[in-house]
């Protein structure tokens, strides 16, 4: 059994709107295979606004 790890940081705010849905897709061609997402991490930061009164 072969195991692969994919790790990539993508600056999504350059490509997608503020609200999105994320999904996964995988294929092996004509052969059957089971794909499992064993962990998932998502981090989001909103740019804050500051005001001085």
UniProtKB/Swiss-Prot annotation:
Which cysteines share a disulfide bond?
Answer: none
- Asked if the Swiss-Prot or TrEMBL record annotates the protein with the keyword Chloroplast, the reply is no
Pfam families hit by this protein: Lectin_legB (PF00139)
Report the InterPro entries cross-referenced here: ConA-like_dom_sf (IPR013320), Lectin_LegA_CS (IPR000985), Legume_lectin_dom (IPR001220)
Q: A single GO molecular function, which one? A: D-mannose binding
Q: Which UniProt keywords apply?
A: Lectin, Mannose-binding
Q: What family is reported?
A: Belongs to the leguminous lectin family.
* Subunit structure, interactors included: Tetramer of two alpha and two beta chains.
Protein's recorded name: Mannose/glucose-specific lectin alpha 1 chain
State the organism of origin.
Lathyrus ochrus
């Amino acid at each position: 059994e072969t195991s692969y790890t994919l790790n990539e940081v993508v600056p999504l705010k350059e490509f997608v709107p503020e609200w999105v849905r994320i999904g996964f897709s995988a294929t092996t061609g004509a052969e059957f295979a089971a794909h499992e997402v064993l962990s998932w991490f998502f981090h989001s930061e909103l740019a804050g606004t500051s005001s001085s009164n």
